[in-house]
Amino acid sequence: MGARHLLALLLVLLVLGFEVQGAQVPQQDEAANTTLLTQVQESLLSYWDSTKAAAQDLYKKTYLTTMDEKIRDMFSKSTAAVSTYVGIFTDQLLSLLKGDE
């Protein structure tokens, strides 16, 4: 083998060696990223749980039966009105699509 072939072989082996070393680094980074992601998820879930518990406690402390009845009444009236208008809109849309027969 000539010196050129030996030099080319050495360069190819050197490049392959760096590729192998470079391929191992992202796997370690992925493991670090997954642990970081897990930590972020756990902290967000703990914040969510504490916020939810605080909101439930506040609701229980300020619960008023008269206000609850008013809210339920408003909900039932608004639901009835919306269902009426949705029915009218559906009939108009069907007659528009169906056309004159």
From Swiss-Prot:
Residues annotated as region Lipid binding? 66-74
Main location group:
secreted
Q: Which GO terms describe its cellular component?
A: chylomicron; high-density lipoprotein particle; low-density lipoprotein particle; very-low-density lipoprotein particle
Gene Ontology molecular function terms on file: phospholipase activator activity; phospholipase binding
Query: Which interval of the chain is the signal sequence?
Result: 1-22
State which residue ranges cross the membrane: none
Which parts form a coiled-coil structure per UniProt?
none
Q: Where is this region: Lipoprotein lipase cofactor?
A: 78-101
Q: Which UniProt keywords apply?
A: Chylomicron, Glycoprotein, HDL, LDL, Lipid degradation, Lipid metabolism, Lipid transport, Secreted, Sialic acid, Signal, Transport, VLDL
What does the PTM comment of the record read? Proapolipoprotein C-II is synthesized as a sialic acid containing glycoprotein which is subsequently desialylated prior to its proteolytic processing. Proapolipoprotein C-II, the major form found in plasma undergoes proteolytic cleavage of its N-terminal hexapeptide to generate apolipoprotein C-II, which occurs as the minor form in plasma.
- Physiological role: Component of chylomicrons, very low-density lipoproteins (VLDL), low-density lipoproteins (LDL), and high-density lipoproteins (HDL) in plasma. Plays an important role in lipoprotein metabolism as an activator of lipoprotein lipase. Both proapolipoprotein C-II and apolipoprotein C-II can activate lipoprotein lipase.
Q: Which family does it belong to?
A: Belongs to the apolipoprotein C2 family.
* Name of the protein in its database record: Apolipoprotein C-II
- Report the source organism: Tapirus indicus
What taxonomic ancestry is recorded?
A: Eukaryota, Metazoa, Chordata, Craniata, Vertebrata
